[in-house]
Amino acid sequence: MAFVTRQFVRSMSSSSSASAAAKKILIKHVTVIGGGLMGAGIAQVAAATGHTVVLVDQTEDILAKSKKGIEESLKRMAKKKFTENPKAADEFVEKTLSSLSTSTDAASVVHSTDLVVEAIVENLKLKNELFQRLDKFAAEHTIFASNTSSLQITNIANATTRQDRFAGLHFFNPVPMMKLVEVIKTPMTSQKTFESLVDFCKTLGKHPVSCKDTPGFIVNRLLVPYLIEAIRLHERGDASKEDIDTAMKLGAGYPMGPFELLDYVGLDTTKFILDGWHEMDPENPLFQPSPSMNNLVAQKKLGKKTGEGFYKYK
C-alpha cells in the first residue's frame, strides 16, 4: 500500500510539474523599446543567447548609433572569449548581429513578439502612453516588462489590459557584464508570467532575484539611502568625502566609495529616484532630499558625465 501511495504521489507531482511547465511561455522573440545604454545592452545579451531581437527607437540615427555600440561591445567580448580562435570570434559577432534588427515603428513589430522590454526615460506618463498603444497591437500571449529602476510597476501596468502579463525586469548597467536581474511581481502578475521571465533571465546567463513592487526594489532600496546617508554625514561636517570614500573601500570592501559611485551613476539620476520616493512617502526619513546634491544638480554638476559632481574630472 505504501508503495502504491508513493507511486501515486510521484505521478501527481510529475503531472503537476509538467502541467505548470507547459503553461509557461518560451520566450524566443524579444522587442526592446529604447536604444540607449540599457536598451542596447538588453538587446545585445538577448541576441547573443539565441533570441530573435528587434530594437526600437524614434529615429534611424539613434538606432544606427545603438547598433554600432552593440557591435563594438560584441567584438570586445568575442576577443576575450575566443582568444585563440579569431575565426570563432568573428562568427560569434556575425551570428549575434544577424539575430538583431531595428525599427522605428514599435506597433508594427510587437504583433509577433513574445516579450516587450521597455527601457525608455523614467517618465510615468510616457511609459503609460507607450504601453497603452502597444497593448492594442501585441499578441494575446505577449508579456510586457519595464526596466524602470524607480517607478512602481503597478502604475505602469495599469495603463494596459494585461496586468497579469506585466512585470518588472530591472537589469543593471553595463548589461552584458552585470549578472543580476530583479524580476518584479505586482499583485496582478500571474505565476505563469513570473516563471516565464525567470526562465528567460536564466537563458540570458543572468541570475534572477524576485521582489515585490516596492519602491527601489532590492538594490536601489538599500543602495540609495546608503548614498544619501553618506552625503548627510559630509553635510554635518563629520567627515570629508575623501575619507568617507576611503573608509568604505578599505573598511567595508566596497569597490567604490559612495561619492565616487554617486558621480559615476549621475547625481541627477539619484535625485530623480529620491524625489520620486519622497513624493510617495514624504514622512520617511530615508527619503528626505539632500541640499548639497540638489545644489549640484541645479548647477548642472551631475558627476563624471559633466566633468564635475562631488569631485572634478579632467
From Swiss-Prot:
Q: Where is this chain's protein located in or outside the cell? A: Mitochondrion matrix
Where on the chain is N6-succinyllysine found, per UniProt? K80, K81, K87, K136, K185, K192, K202, K206, K212, K241, K312
| Residues involved in NAD(+) binding | G34, G35, G36, L37, M38, G39, D57, E122, K127, S149, N173, K305
Catalysed reactions listed for this entry: a (3S)-3-hydroxyacyl-CoA + NAD(+) = a 3-oxoacyl-CoA + NADH + H(+); (3S)-3-hydroxybutanoyl-CoA + NAD(+) = acetoacetyl-CoA + NADH + H(+); (3S)-hydroxydecanoyl-CoA + NAD(+) = 3-oxodecanoyl-CoA + NADH + H(+); (3S)-hydroxyhexadecanoyl-CoA + NAD(+) = 3-oxohexadecanoyl-CoA + NADH + H(+)
PROSITE patterns recorded: 3HCDH
CC terms in the record's Gene Ontology section: mitochondrial matrix; mitochondrion; nucleoplasm
This molecule's function is given as: Mitochondrial fatty acid beta-oxidation enzyme that catalyzes the third step of the beta-oxidation cycle for medium and short-chain 3-hydroxy fatty acyl-CoAs (C4 to C10). Plays a role in the control of insulin secretion by inhibiting the activation of glutamate dehydrogenase 1 (GLUD1), an enzyme that has an important role in regulating amino acid-induced insulin secretion. Plays a role in the maintenance of normal spermatogenesis through the reduction of fatty acid accumulation in the testes.
Q: What is this protein called?
A: Hydroxyacyl-coenzyme A dehydrogenase, mitochondrial
Q: Which organism is it from?
A: Rattus norvegicus (Rat)
